[in-house]
Amino acid sequence: MAEGEDGTWWRSWLQQSYSSVRDKSAEALEFMKRDLTEFTRVVQHDTACTIAATASVVKDKLVVEGSSGTTDKVKKGLSNFLGVISDTFAPSPDKTIDCDVITLMATPSGTTELYDSTKARLYSLQSDPATYCNEPDGSPAEFDAWLAYWDPEHRKAEISELLVTSPSIRALYTKMVPAAVSHSEFWQRYFYKVHQLEQEEARRDALKQRADQSVHSEEPQWEEEEEDFVGAASAPNFKLEEKYVISPPTIPTLHVEDKSEKMAELNRDHTSITSPSESSESISPITQIANPEYIEQTATKESSPRPLTVKEKNGAGTDESSAHAPVEQITGKSNAQIGTHREDPPSDLRVFELNSDSGKSTPSNNGQKGSSTDVSEDWEKDFDMTEEEVQMALSRVEVSGEVDDEDWENWE
Protein backbone atom coordinates (compact mmCIF):
# COMPACT_ATOMS: atom_id res chain seq x y z
CA MET A 1 0.00 0.00 0.00
CA ALA A 2 2.70 2.37 0.98
CA GLU A 3 4.77 1.63 -2.09
CA GLY A 4 1.74 2.16 -4.37
CA GLU A 5 0.99 5.51 -2.81
CA ASP A 6 4.60 6.65 -3.22
CA GLY A 7 4.57 5.72 -6.92
CA THR A 8 1.41 7.66 -7.60
CA TRP A 9 2.78 10.72 -5.82
CA TRP A 10 5.94 10.77 -7.90
CA ARG A 11 3.93 10.27 -11.06
CA SER A 12 1.61 13.15 -10.28
CA TRP A 13 4.56 15.47 -9.40
CA LEU A 14 6.29 14.71 -12.68
CA GLN A 15 3.12 15.40 -14.64
CA GLN A 16 2.60 18.70 -12.90
CA SER A 17 6.20 19.75 -13.48
CA TYR A 18 6.04 18.83 -17.14
CA SER A 19 2.80 20.71 -17.64
CA SER A 20 4.17 23.86 -15.92
CA VAL A 21 7.37 23.78 -18.00
CA ARG A 22 5.36 23.31 -21.17
CA ASP A 23 3.10 26.22 -20.34
CA LYS A 24 6.02 28.52 -19.55
CA SER A 25 7.83 27.53 -22.73
CA ALA A 26 4.73 28.23 -24.76
CA GLU A 27 4.41 31.66 -23.19
CA ALA A 28 8.08 32.46 -23.85
CA LEU A 29 7.70 31.32 -27.43
CA GLU A 30 4.67 33.51 -27.86
CA PHE A 31 6.60 36.51 -26.49
CA MET A 32 9.47 35.84 -28.88
CA LYS A 33 7.16 35.52 -31.85
CA ARG A 34 5.39 38.73 -30.96
CA ASP A 35 8.71 40.62 -30.56
CA LEU A 36 10.06 39.34 -33.86
CA THR A 37 6.85 40.30 -35.61
CA GLU A 38 6.95 43.79 -34.16
CA PHE A 39 10.63 44.23 -35.05
CA THR A 40 10.02 43.04 -38.59
CA ARG A 41 7.11 45.40 -38.97
CA VAL A 42 9.17 48.39 -37.69
CA VAL A 43 12.10 47.59 -39.97
CA GLN A 44 9.83 47.19 -42.95
CA HIS A 45 8.10 50.46 -42.16
CA ASP A 46 11.34 52.37 -41.73
CA THR A 47 12.78 50.88 -44.88
CA ALA A 48 9.69 51.78 -46.82
CA CYS A 49 9.77 55.34 -45.47
CA THR A 50 13.46 55.71 -46.32
CA ILE A 51 12.95 54.38 -49.81
CA ALA A 52 10.00 56.66 -50.32
CA ALA A 53 11.89 59.69 -49.03
CA THR A 54 14.91 58.86 -51.19
CA ALA A 55 12.74 58.39 -54.23
CA SER A 56 10.97 61.70 -53.65
CA VAL A 57 14.27 63.56 -53.16
CA VAL A 58 15.79 62.00 -56.25
CA LYS A 59 12.67 62.82 -58.21
CA ASP A 60 12.73 66.47 -57.06
CA LYS A 61 16.47 67.13 -57.33
CA LEU A 62 17.56 65.20 -60.38
CA VAL A 63 16.15 65.81 -63.79
CA VAL A 64 17.41 63.42 -66.40
CA GLU A 65 16.79 64.10 -70.04
CA GLY A 66 15.04 61.36 -71.92
CA SER A 67 17.42 59.27 -73.99
CA SER A 68 17.98 55.71 -75.00
CA GLY A 69 20.85 53.32 -74.83
CA THR A 70 22.99 51.68 -72.19
CA THR A 71 25.11 54.80 -71.62
CA ASP A 72 22.08 56.85 -70.70
CA LYS A 73 20.92 54.20 -68.27
CA VAL A 74 24.32 54.14 -66.57
CA LYS A 75 24.33 57.91 -66.34
CA LYS A 76 20.85 57.87 -64.88
CA GLY A 77 21.74 55.27 -62.25
CA LEU A 78 24.94 57.09 -61.33
CA SER A 79 23.16 60.40 -61.04
CA ASN A 80 20.51 58.80 -58.84
CA PHE A 81 23.20 57.35 -56.57
CA LEU A 82 25.07 60.64 -56.30
CA GLY A 83 21.83 62.49 -55.63
CA VAL A 84 21.01 60.20 -52.71
CA ILE A 85 24.49 60.71 -51.23
CA SER A 86 24.31 64.49 -51.61
CA ASP A 87 20.87 64.64 -50.00
CA THR A 88 22.07 62.45 -47.13
CA PHE A 89 25.11 64.55 -46.21
CA ALA A 90 24.12 68.05 -47.44
CA PRO A 91 22.20 70.38 -45.10
CA SER A 92 18.72 71.59 -45.83
CA PRO A 93 18.32 74.76 -47.92
CA ASP A 94 17.25 76.87 -44.94
CA LYS A 95 20.36 75.94 -42.95
CA THR A 96 23.67 77.76 -43.33
CA ILE A 97 27.17 77.01 -42.16
CA ASP A 98 28.68 79.98 -40.30
CA CYS A 99 32.27 79.63 -41.46
CA ASP A 100 34.52 82.36 -42.80
CA VAL A 101 36.23 79.97 -45.20
CA ILE A 102 33.07 79.34 -47.22
CA THR A 103 32.45 81.96 -49.87
CA LEU A 104 28.96 80.78 -50.89
CA MET A 105 25.98 80.08 -48.68
CA ALA A 106 22.47 78.77 -49.20
CA THR A 107 19.50 81.08 -48.83
CA PRO A 108 16.09 80.10 -47.48
CA SER A 109 14.72 80.12 -51.02
CA GLY A 110 17.19 77.41 -52.11
CA THR A 111 19.67 79.61 -54.01
CA THR A 112 23.27 80.48 -53.20
CA GLU A 113 24.93 83.84 -52.73
CA LEU A 114 28.20 85.30 -51.52
CA TYR A 115 28.94 84.67 -47.89
CA ASP A 116 28.04 87.46 -45.48
CA SER A 117 28.42 87.03 -41.73
CA THR A 118 25.41 89.23 -40.95
CA LYS A 119 23.12 87.37 -43.32
CA ALA A 120 24.46 84.04 -42.11
CA ARG A 121 23.56 84.93 -38.52
CA LEU A 122 20.14 86.11 -39.65
CA TYR A 123 19.42 82.85 -41.50
CA SER A 124 20.60 80.84 -38.48
CA LEU A 125 18.35 82.92 -36.21
CA GLN A 126 15.34 82.37 -38.50
CA SER A 127 15.72 78.59 -38.53
CA ASP A 128 16.28 78.23 -34.75
CA PRO A 129 13.11 77.27 -32.82
CA ALA A 130 14.58 78.80 -29.63
CA THR A 131 14.17 82.22 -31.23
CA TYR A 132 10.39 81.92 -30.98
CA CYS A 133 9.93 79.62 -27.95
CA ASN A 134 12.32 81.07 -25.36
CA GLU A 135 12.31 84.45 -23.70
CA PRO A 136 14.62 87.03 -25.30
CA ASP A 137 18.19 87.36 -24.03
CA GLY A 138 19.21 90.40 -22.04
CA SER A 139 17.46 92.37 -19.35
CA PRO A 140 13.63 92.38 -19.30
CA ALA A 141 13.67 96.17 -18.93
CA GLU A 142 15.28 96.56 -22.35
CA PHE A 143 12.73 94.20 -23.87
CA ASP A 144 9.86 96.15 -22.28
CA ALA A 145 11.32 99.43 -23.53
CA TRP A 146 11.52 97.98 -27.03
CA LEU A 147 7.93 96.72 -26.81
CA ALA A 148 6.79 100.27 -26.06
CA TYR A 149 7.74 101.20 -29.64
CA TRP A 150 6.58 97.91 -31.19
CA ASP A 151 3.71 98.27 -33.67
CA PRO A 152 2.59 95.09 -35.50
CA GLU A 153 0.60 97.11 -38.05
CA HIS A 154 3.78 98.56 -39.53
CA ARG A 155 5.26 95.05 -39.80
CA LYS A 156 2.46 93.37 -41.75
CA ALA A 157 4.15 93.70 -45.12
CA GLU A 158 7.47 92.41 -43.76
CA ILE A 159 5.73 89.49 -41.99
CA SER A 160 3.96 88.47 -45.19
CA GLU A 161 7.21 88.62 -47.15
CA LEU A 162 8.99 86.46 -44.56
CA LEU A 163 6.25 83.82 -44.62
CA VAL A 164 6.48 83.66 -48.41
CA THR A 165 10.27 83.76 -48.92
CA SER A 166 11.50 81.80 -45.87
CA PRO A 167 10.39 78.16 -45.67
CA SER A 168 11.94 77.73 -42.21
CA ILE A 169 9.92 80.61 -40.69
CA ARG A 170 6.79 79.37 -42.42
CA ALA A 171 7.26 75.81 -41.07
CA LEU A 172 7.97 76.99 -37.52
CA TYR A 173 5.04 79.40 -37.61
CA THR A 174 2.73 76.61 -38.71
CA LYS A 175 3.91 74.29 -35.89
CA MET A 176 4.09 76.78 -33.02
CA VAL A 177 1.21 79.19 -33.60
CA PRO A 178 -1.09 78.93 -31.75
CA ALA A 179 -0.06 75.62 -30.10
CA ALA A 180 3.08 76.87 -28.30
CA VAL A 181 3.05 80.67 -28.62
CA SER A 182 0.66 83.31 -29.80
CA HIS A 183 0.93 85.21 -33.06
CA SER A 184 2.11 88.43 -31.36
CA GLU A 185 4.68 86.66 -29.15
CA PHE A 186 6.07 84.78 -32.14
CA TRP A 187 6.80 87.96 -34.10
CA GLN A 188 7.78 90.06 -31.08
CA ARG A 189 10.51 87.62 -30.13
CA TYR A 190 11.69 87.28 -33.72
CA PHE A 191 11.94 91.02 -34.40
CA TYR A 192 13.56 91.66 -31.00
CA LYS A 193 16.23 89.09 -31.86
CA VAL A 194 16.75 90.87 -35.17
CA HIS A 195 17.01 94.17 -33.28
CA GLN A 196 19.70 92.74 -30.98
CA LEU A 197 21.57 91.40 -34.00
CA GLU A 198 21.51 94.83 -35.64
CA GLN A 199 22.82 96.47 -32.46
CA GLU A 200 25.65 93.95 -32.25
CA GLU A 201 26.60 94.57 -35.88
CA ALA A 202 26.52 98.33 -35.29
CA ARG A 203 28.90 97.95 -32.34
CA ARG A 204 31.23 95.84 -34.42
CA ASP A 205 31.24 98.38 -37.24
CA ALA A 206 31.93 101.21 -34.79
CA LEU A 207 34.84 99.31 -33.26
CA LYS A 208 36.21 98.53 -36.70
CA GLN A 209 35.97 102.17 -37.81
CA ARG A 210 37.60 103.32 -34.58
CA ALA A 211 40.45 100.88 -35.08
CA ASP A 212 40.94 102.04 -38.68
CA GLN A 213 40.92 105.69 -37.62
CA SER A 214 43.44 105.05 -34.86
CA VAL A 215 45.73 103.28 -37.31
CA HIS A 216 45.50 106.10 -39.87
CA SER A 217 45.95 108.78 -37.22
CA GLU A 218 48.95 107.10 -35.62
CA GLU A 219 50.95 106.61 -38.82
CA PRO A 220 51.71 110.34 -39.46
CA GLN A 221 52.43 110.87 -35.78
CA TRP A 222 55.09 108.20 -35.92
CA GLU A 223 56.67 109.94 -38.92
CA GLU A 224 56.63 113.29 -37.12
CA GLU A 225 58.16 111.75 -34.04
CA GLU A 226 60.89 110.20 -36.17
CA GLU A 227 61.60 113.57 -37.81
CA ASP A 228 61.69 115.28 -34.41
CA PHE A 229 63.99 112.59 -33.11
CA VAL A 230 66.34 112.96 -36.08
CA GLY A 231 66.38 116.75 -35.66
CA ALA A 232 66.95 116.50 -31.93
CA ALA A 233 69.74 114.00 -32.46
CA SER A 234 71.51 116.09 -35.11
CA ALA A 235 71.27 119.44 -33.25
CA PRO A 236 73.37 118.46 -30.21
CA ASN A 237 76.14 117.22 -32.50
CA PHE A 238 76.81 120.76 -33.71
CA LYS A 239 76.63 122.04 -30.15
CA LEU A 240 79.09 119.45 -29.02
CA GLU A 241 81.47 120.36 -31.80
CA GLU A 242 81.23 124.01 -30.83
CA LYS A 243 81.52 123.22 -27.15
CA TYR A 244 84.59 121.02 -27.31
CA VAL A 245 86.80 123.32 -29.39
CA ILE A 246 90.30 122.92 -28.00
CA SER A 247 91.61 126.25 -26.77
CA PRO A 248 95.35 127.04 -26.82
CA PRO A 249 97.11 126.14 -23.58
CA THR A 250 97.69 128.96 -21.17
CA ILE A 251 100.23 129.09 -18.35
CA PRO A 252 98.42 129.90 -15.12
CA THR A 253 99.86 132.48 -12.79
CA LEU A 254 100.37 131.21 -9.31
CA HIS A 255 99.70 133.62 -6.46
CA VAL A 256 101.32 132.51 -3.24
CA GLU A 257 99.18 133.95 -0.49
CA ASP A 258 99.35 131.25 2.12
CA LYS A 259 101.07 132.25 5.36
CA SER A 260 102.75 128.88 5.59
CA GLU A 261 104.48 129.45 2.24
CA LYS A 262 105.63 132.91 3.39
CA MET A 263 107.13 131.42 6.51
CA ALA A 264 108.82 128.79 4.35
CA GLU A 265 110.48 131.53 2.31
CA LEU A 266 111.63 133.31 5.48
CA ASN A 267 113.11 130.13 6.88
CA ARG A 268 114.89 129.51 3.59
CA ASP A 269 116.48 133.00 3.77
CA HIS A 270 117.55 132.37 7.38
CA THR A 271 119.35 129.18 6.44
CA SER A 272 121.23 130.94 3.64
CA ILE A 273 122.53 133.58 6.12
CA THR A 274 123.86 131.10 8.71
CA SER A 275 125.90 129.11 6.18
CA PRO A 276 127.41 131.40 3.54
CA SER A 277 129.42 128.62 1.93
CA GLU A 278 126.33 126.53 1.49
CA SER A 279 124.22 129.39 0.18
CA SER A 280 126.89 130.32 -2.33
CA GLU A 281 126.74 126.91 -3.98
CA SER A 282 123.23 125.66 -3.18
CA ILE A 283 120.84 128.52 -3.68
CA SER A 284 117.07 127.98 -3.69
CA PRO A 285 115.47 127.16 -7.08
CA ILE A 286 113.79 130.56 -7.13
CA THR A 287 117.16 132.38 -7.05
CA GLN A 288 118.61 130.10 -9.71
CA ILE A 289 115.74 130.69 -12.10
CA ALA A 290 115.48 134.43 -11.42
CA ASN A 291 119.25 134.89 -12.09
CA PRO A 292 120.19 133.10 -15.33
CA GLU A 293 123.73 134.54 -15.10
CA TYR A 294 124.15 132.75 -11.82
CA ILE A 295 123.35 129.42 -13.46
CA GLU A 296 126.34 129.80 -15.79
CA GLN A 297 128.57 130.74 -12.86
CA THR A 298 127.50 127.70 -10.85
CA ALA A 299 128.45 125.45 -13.75
CA THR A 300 132.08 126.68 -13.48
CA LYS A 301 132.01 126.68 -9.68
CA GLU A 302 131.15 123.01 -9.55
CA SER A 303 134.17 122.06 -11.65
CA SER A 304 136.74 124.04 -9.58
CA PRO A 305 136.59 125.95 -6.30
CA ARG A 306 136.76 129.73 -6.60
CA PRO A 307 137.92 132.42 -4.16
CA LEU A 308 135.62 134.99 -2.77
CA THR A 309 135.03 137.96 -5.04
CA VAL A 310 134.97 141.60 -4.14
CA LYS A 311 131.22 141.61 -4.22
CA GLU A 312 131.09 138.79 -1.73
CA LYS A 313 133.63 140.59 0.52
CA ASN A 314 131.60 143.73 0.31
CA GLY A 315 128.56 141.65 1.03
CA ALA A 316 130.26 140.26 4.12
CA GLY A 317 131.13 143.76 5.22
CA THR A 318 127.64 144.92 4.71
CA ASP A 319 126.43 141.91 6.63
CA GLU A 320 128.38 143.07 9.69
CA SER A 321 127.04 146.60 9.33
CA SER A 322 123.53 145.47 8.73
CA ALA A 323 123.52 142.89 11.50
CA HIS A 324 122.28 145.54 13.91
CA ALA A 325 119.35 146.47 11.65
CA PRO A 326 115.94 145.96 13.17
CA VAL A 327 114.15 142.72 12.55
CA GLU A 328 111.19 144.53 11.00
CA GLN A 329 113.40 145.90 8.22
CA ILE A 330 114.74 142.42 7.52
CA THR A 331 111.27 140.94 7.32
CA GLY A 332 110.16 143.78 5.04
CA LYS A 333 113.07 143.15 2.69
CA SER A 334 112.39 139.43 2.67
CA ASN A 335 108.78 140.13 1.84
CA ALA A 336 109.94 142.40 -0.95
CA GLN A 337 112.07 139.60 -2.29
CA ILE A 338 109.07 137.28 -2.18
CA GLY A 339 107.00 139.89 -4.00
CA THR A 340 109.58 140.13 -6.78
CA HIS A 341 109.37 136.42 -7.24
CA ARG A 342 105.57 136.50 -7.31
CA GLU A 343 105.59 138.90 -10.23
CA ASP A 344 107.30 136.30 -12.39
CA PRO A 345 104.70 133.54 -13.03
CA PRO A 346 106.86 131.32 -15.30
CA SER A 347 109.60 131.16 -12.67
CA ASP A 348 107.05 130.11 -10.04
CA LEU A 349 105.76 127.36 -12.35
CA ARG A 350 109.27 126.02 -12.80
CA VAL A 351 109.86 126.14 -9.06
CA PHE A 352 106.88 123.85 -8.45
CA GLU A 353 108.02 121.53 -11.19
CA LEU A 354 111.51 121.31 -9.67
CA ASN A 355 110.16 120.76 -6.18
CA SER A 356 107.76 118.04 -7.34
CA ASP A 357 110.61 116.10 -8.94
CA SER A 358 111.64 113.78 -6.11
CA GLY A 359 114.06 111.40 -7.79
CA LYS A 360 116.65 113.86 -9.16
CA SER A 361 120.07 114.49 -7.62
CA THR A 362 120.88 117.93 -6.26
CA PRO A 363 124.31 119.37 -5.44
CA SER A 364 125.34 118.80 -1.88
CA ASN A 365 126.64 121.40 0.57
CA ASN A 366 130.26 120.66 -0.21
CA GLY A 367 129.78 121.05 -3.97
CA GLN A 368 129.98 117.35 -4.89
CA LYS A 369 127.79 116.13 -7.75
CA GLY A 370 125.67 112.98 -7.95
CA SER A 371 124.67 112.71 -4.30
CA SER A 372 120.91 111.96 -4.37
CA THR A 373 118.95 113.21 -1.40
CA ASP A 374 115.37 112.87 -0.34
CA VAL A 375 112.79 115.59 -0.96
CA SER A 376 112.24 116.09 2.73
CA GLU A 377 115.98 116.66 3.32
CA ASP A 378 116.08 119.26 0.51
CA TRP A 379 113.19 121.14 2.04
CA GLU A 380 114.82 121.06 5.47
CA LYS A 381 118.08 122.32 3.96
CA ASP A 382 116.27 125.19 2.19
CA PHE A 383 114.33 126.13 5.30
CA ASP A 384 117.40 126.05 7.63
CA MET A 385 118.59 129.65 7.13
CA THR A 386 119.81 132.25 9.58
CA GLU A 387 119.56 136.00 9.61
CA GLU A 388 123.14 136.34 8.34
CA GLU A 389 122.32 134.34 5.20
CA VAL A 390 119.21 136.42 4.63
CA GLN A 391 121.27 139.64 4.94
CA MET A 392 123.87 138.17 2.59
CA ALA A 393 121.26 137.38 -0.04
CA LEU A 394 119.73 140.83 0.24
CA SER A 395 123.11 142.55 -0.08
CA ARG A 396 123.91 140.44 -3.14
CA VAL A 397 120.68 141.51 -4.77
CA GLU A 398 121.41 145.18 -3.99
CA VAL A 399 124.93 144.98 -5.44
CA SER A 400 123.76 143.21 -8.62
CA GLY A 401 121.17 145.94 -9.17
CA GLU A 402 118.13 143.66 -9.58
CA VAL A 403 116.04 145.73 -7.17
CA ASP A 404 116.02 149.54 -7.34
CA ASP A 405 116.06 151.83 -4.35
CA GLU A 406 112.67 153.18 -5.29
CA ASP A 407 111.21 149.68 -5.14
CA TRP A 408 112.76 149.18 -1.71
CA GLU A 409 111.28 152.41 -0.50
CA ASN A 410 107.89 151.40 -1.84
CA TRP A 411 108.09 148.03 -0.12
CA GLU A 412 109.25 149.61 3.13
UniProtKB/Swiss-Prot annotation:
InterPro entries (alphabetical): BSD_dom, BSD_dom_sf, BSD_domain-containing
Region (Disordered): 208-228, 255-383
Compositionally biased tracts (Polar residues): 355-374
Biased composition (Low complexity): 272-287
PROSITE patterns named in the record: BSD
Source domain of life: Eukaryota
Pfam entry (one): BSD
Gene3D superfamilies in alphabetical order: BSD domain (1.10.3970.10)
Biased amino acid composition, Basic and acidic residues: 208-219, 255-271, 340-351
SUPFAM superfamilies on file: BSD domain-like
Chain ranges of the BSD domain: 146-198
PANTHER family per UniProt: BSD DOMAIN-CONTAINING PROTEIN 1, SYNAPSE-ASSOCIATED PROTEIN
UniProt protein name: BSD domain-containing protein 1
Source species: Xenopus tropicalis (Western clawed frog)
